Amino acid sequence: MSIDLTRREFATIGALALGARSWGQCNADRLATPYKLGRQVLSASGQQGQFDSLSVDGPFVFSHEGRFYMTFIAFDGTGYQTGLASSANLVDWKKEGVILKRDPSSPTLRYSVALGWILRENGLYSPGKLKPVDGHFLGVYQVYPSQGYEIGAGMIGVARSKDLRQWDAAPPVLRPEDGAEWERGGLYKPCLVESEGTYYLFYNAKNHTDWPWREQTGVATAKDLKSWTRFAGNPIIPNGPPGSMDEIFASDPCVLQDGSRWAFFYYGLDAKGVARDFVATGPDLTHASKCAGALIDVGPPGSVDSEYAHKPSVIAWKGDLYHFYCAVSQVNGKEARGISVARSRPWN
């Protein structure tokens, strides 16, 4: 999900303290990607009437048939739609157009539809190939009930495709009103993992529909992709204590297997309005301990990510980790929101 103008009014934030787990219970050195490319690899078109006219956001990167692909969320003033881009080297990207459009005739997809994840290999250092089920690729999406930028209480659903270009979005399977108090305000970015015959649907959610609110990350499970059970121990990635770097948001999960453990990449938002990417690790898919420090921090004034460096998507290639994220800065007094990347090895 994204930070809009209302969510930047942090002067109104009280010193609310939600359940927190301590930092520093894991070592994130092997997951570090300190070498930023320093520019956007995917940008808004700036062309009025185009689906990506105002911003591109929310990357999900994978490999397929010998190439790399990225789904991304585009905003045109009405709502989100989902685009696809391709690359041979994870740096030079070409947009291929819209793959999941809003549908004015649909009560669910009328204003927006944002594909956040497609079921892929679990391994962090795997090629990141997709995992078809019954001849279809499985994706998970988020939608919002009103026109505008993430307006209203979001919901999550499952979508299917045979070719990655045309998607059939089924009705939502997770709704905020069916959840606990921490998620009653609306659901955000989904992440779908299959392990030992069980599907795990990770998502972040907010406790109030209207600002101010807090966001945390939880998980639901299913065998059939239809009947989902929320984990009793949610949220599995809660907000940190007052003064921490994820005091306000702990959001946008990207969950991958790192050997015998799981890595839960996510972004945190602090009370000053700074958004950064972090990671937690755990022995299974329902327990996570936060690692100390940011994996991707904001850059200095004038840099591509001087305002926000958030919303992780991680893939490995030739032994290197590539950490894609939404980079936000100000250019000529206007927000420049696009996709950038950092990796584990220097670029030169």
Show the residue positions of the predicted features:
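N-terminal secretory signal peptides and thylakoid transit peptides that target proteins
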Residues: 1-18
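C-terminal segment of classical bacterial N-terminal signal peptides
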Residues: 21-22
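Beta-strand-rich binding-surface signature
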Residues: 189
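Predominantly extracellular/luminal carbohydrate-interaction, adhesion, and secreted-enzyme modules
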Residues: 310
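Conserved active-site neighborhood of enzyme catalytic/cofactor-binding cores
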Residues: 313
